[in-house]
Amino acid sequence: MANEMEFEKPILELKSKIADLKEYNETSDVDLTNEIEKLEKRLAKLESSIYSNMTAWDKFQVARHPERPTTLDYISLLFEDFMELHGDRAFGDDAAIVGGIATFHGIPVTVIGHQRGKDTKDNLHRNFGMPHPEGFRKALRLMKQADKFGRPIICFIDTKGAYPGRAAEERGQSEAIARNLYEMSDMKVPIISIVIGEGGSGGALALGVGNQIFMLENAVFSVISPEGAAAILWKDASQAKKAAESMRITAGDLFELGITDGIIPEVKGGAHRDLNAQAEEINKTITKSLHALMAFSEEQLIEQRYEKFKKIGVYDTL
């Protein structure tokens, strides 16, 4: 089957066998109902075993799945009256980042996120979700607007990283990312960041200075891809599996390290299996987080955000 992952092969083989038996059962005089029921029970156990024991590399594959829901998929289900806003008012628009104003259960909010493409043409248009400086500056423009009008900011993170091309560097890629980090740290409104797929390095951090940061269960967050790390450490990109295990990139790892504030459960097999169910899980998390943060004063929001990031990386205190 297309877009299925290596670790799912035993599941797919058993599903195929069950499908063949069901087809044969409908056209023959032999009753295979009992055999089919046994295989379906075996399939349920196999799925439970495989999906509950996924390695970091397995989760990385799920995070990169071509059918994984994108920012716009979630926006259409989670928010009302979304109006997309374009451009950074300096150079141009960047389709790798989408953003605009909307309402969330009646609360006016600003929503921003990385946007991958759905097919080859769309991916080329959106640069595979890797923003140029104008994308980060567009995001910052929308954040400043939200800060001015008192709208909470909700960010969806899903990028391999900021685009490393020459033109992007010439237009100030590193400055654009650094500026976002600087400005976000002093915003007077609640900021919620959710890693829905890949959280790649500075490209992810530019939308990640939140009062609360969450990750979907199979999302990843790292300074470099496993392939890139393997190429540097072992001069061999084929060692990506080994690198993924060493880098501590999973939602569980990041929560344990105190970098994120929670893990959003995923539907069995990954978010791409059931978009509506996955959106509902995200809805619960945003609702709870937003109501908690909206009780803070402006000064408390800034202080809480500052203290949160100051504690990251602390091993011990005297």
From Swiss-Prot:
GO terms for cellular component: acetyl-CoA carboxylase complex. Its EC number is 2.1.3.15. One of its GO terms (biological process) is malonyl-CoA biosynthetic process. It holds the Pfam family ACCA. InterPro entries: Acetyl_CoA_COase_a_su, ClpP/crotonase-like_dom_sf, COA_CT_C. Belongs to the AccA family. NCBIfam families: accA, AccA_sub, PRK05724.1. Component of the acetyl coenzyme A carboxylase (ACC) complex. First, biotin carboxylase catalyzes the carboxylation of biotin on its carrier protein (BCCP) and then the CO(2) group is transferred by the carboxyltransferase to acetyl-CoA to form malonyl-CoA. This is Acetyl-coenzyme A carboxylase carboxyl transferase subunit alpha. It comes from Listeria monocytogenes serotype 4b (strain CLIP80459).
